[in-house]
């Protein structure tokens, strides 16, 4: 009997050790580089997926999120050679332009947005802005008013904000781009072609620039900054006041694509030229993703009903259906429209 007890103890200890090893083998981490404007909806999708993965897949998932401007998110992979599972950007064209074919072989267009001008009741002339939104460019031109946008070289919201001001110049027939951009920064234009130097210099203390658009939210909330160009979804998520811009300039109307396309910007950071177009977000799973199968399962979850509802609850309209290009994984094909 005395011999049996130690043997039983050894067997019990073995089961405990094997059980621990087994549970560790079912843990996984997903690394996501994403646009700052996706932070809130993505975190909510991740929370739901964590429960789903534990219950349905038997996997304990943790997420390593890195929010940045979308250009910077892509360059973490292409220039810095950092490993990630998923890249999600605010301008889908960055994926085919900079990541295919070396880093991924497919991408999905899944959500839309528009540019607005956001502020609070602390902002100078806030009441006037609300009552007379068509005077926005006059208010931003006043010497006691500060405004901001994100860095065009790092963030699509930045280069879109600059293009919105050039489109406004065409739409209103007023020198809006010259007054708000060329006089305050070293960004310049030749006709409808805009050039953003690799190092952008701010020449007027009224103008504030940050790496990504969400970096500007706190400045407006605190009253340190009067107005910002930002995505409508972000303004609503943070309960900011905002004015909408005409469809001809807000980059949110697919019917205005031809008018938008009259304007382009060349980025000093990449050397690439980007035409103004309706805002569409893109997402992909990388070829060398550390947890590629699980990343595709997460993408399937995001594109499904639960993911769609989370995005729409956060004021970000989902494409119906999402549109996919390239070597689309079979796991998501029924959720998307595949195009050549």
UniProtKB/Swiss-Prot annotation:
Keyword Thylakoid: no
Binding site for tungstate: 36-37, 70, 155-157, 213, 231
Binding of molybdate, residues: 36-37, 70, 155-157, 213, 231
Subcellular compartments: Cell membrane
Function summary: Part of the ABC transporter complex WtpABC involved in molybdate/tungstate import. Binds tungstate and molybdate.
Quaternary structure and partners: The complex is composed of two ATP-binding proteins (WtpC), two transmembrane proteins (WtpB) and a solute-binding protein (WtpA).
Entry protein name: Molybdate/tungstate-binding protein WtpA
Gene that encodes the chain: wtpA
């Amino acid at each position: 009997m005395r011999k049996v007890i130690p043997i039983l103890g050894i067997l019990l200890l073995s089961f405990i050790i094997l059980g621990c090893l087994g549970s560790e083998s079912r843990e996984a981490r997903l690394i996501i580089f994403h646009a700052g404007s996706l932070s809130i909806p993505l975190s909510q999708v991740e929370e739901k997926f964590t429960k789903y993965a534990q219950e349905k897949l038997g996997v304990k998932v943790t997420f390593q999120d890195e929010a940045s401007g979308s250009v910077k998110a892509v360059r973490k992979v292409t220039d810095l050679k950092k490993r990630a599972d998923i890249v999600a950007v605010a301008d889908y064209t960055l994926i085919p332009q900079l990541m295919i074919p070396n880093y991924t072989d497919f991408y999905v267009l899944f959500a839309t947005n528009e540019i607005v001008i956001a502020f609070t009741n602390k902002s100078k002339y806030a009441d006037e802005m609300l009552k007379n939104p068509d005077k926005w460019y006059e208010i931003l031109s006043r010497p006691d008013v500060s405004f901001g946008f994100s860095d065009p070289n790092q963030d699509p919201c930045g280069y879109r904000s600059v293009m919105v001001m050039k489109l406004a110049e065409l739409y209103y027939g007023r020198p809006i781009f010259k007054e708000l951009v060329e006089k305050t920064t070293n960004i310049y234009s030749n006709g409808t072609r805009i050039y953003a130097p690799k190092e952008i210099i701010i020449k007027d203390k009224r103008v504030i620039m940050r790496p990504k658009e969400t970096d500007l939210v706190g400045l407006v909330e605190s009253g340190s900054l009067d107005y910002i160009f930002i995505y409508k979804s972000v303004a609503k998520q943070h309960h900011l006041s905002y004015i909408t811009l005409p469809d001809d300039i807000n980059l949110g109307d697919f019917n205005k694509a031809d008018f938008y396309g009259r304007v382009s910007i060349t980025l000093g950071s990449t050397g690439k030229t980007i035409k103004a177009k309706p805002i569409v977000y893109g997402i992909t799973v990388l070829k060398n993703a550390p947890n590629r199968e699980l990343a595709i399962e997460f993408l399937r979850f995001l594109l499904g009903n639960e993911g769609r509802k989370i995005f729409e609850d956060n004021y970000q309209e989902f494409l119906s259906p999402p549109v996919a290009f390239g070597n689309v994984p079979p796991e998501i094909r029924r959720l998307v429209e595949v195009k050549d």
